[in-house]
Amino acid sequence: TSLRHAIGQRKEAVPAIKRARSPHANFSAFNFAIARATFLQHSFDERLKQYGHEDTLFGQDLRYACKTVVHIDNPAYHLDGDSDAEFVEKTEVAIDNLADLIRSGKIDEEVRLFAVYRKLQRTGVLYLIQLLRILFASSIRALLIGGVRSVLLFDFYKLLRLSGHTIKIGRRNF
């Protein structure tokens, strides 16, 4: 199995009842239902040109507009056949896009990766993560591309990638 499949099974194959506990935070474009009028009023932001987090932004927009999201059990099948290298590259673009969305104020801490980033930032541990990125990110990337199917390692790699971005919150740069 591919890295994409392993991640999909672990992160996307979550029952609707569990995702419904925090409906906007767990938003994904393949398993929700909203009123047609709501969708037309709050459609996906066409200005996003980079891969990744279009659905995250859409979910946040719905939350800010106090719109109800109903999660449904709708299995996702990834038929694109991305190699592990292609999947990691897409993930990197998605994290870079997420950083841009955070900087522009469109994404808040309801997004789990950003919430972890902010917690590390507040506690002063982000500097350690940034050092770990310098020391280990390329090795971890090689492991992921080379066949390691660890969701934990993949999530850590995403955090390392995000820590490479300067994200200004308030008057300070991080």
Regions from the language model: what does each represent?
Residues T1-H5, T68:
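Conserved donor NDP-sugar-binding/catalytic core segment of glycosyltransferases
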Residues V14-I34, K49-Y51:
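A recurrent flexible, glycine/aromatic-enriched loop bordering the glycosyltransferase active site
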Residues A37-L40:
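Short, well-ordered alpha-helical scaffold segment located
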Residues Q50-F58:
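Acidic donor-binding loop at a coil-to-helix junction in glycosyltransferase catalytic cores
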Residues G59-R63, L160:
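Short, hydrophobic alpha-helix immediately C-terminal to the catalytic nucleophile
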Residues A65-E89, A94-G105:
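Active-site donor/metal-binding and catalytic loop motifs
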Residues V93, E110-F174:
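Non-catalytic, C-terminal membrane-associated alpha-helical segments of glycosyltransferases
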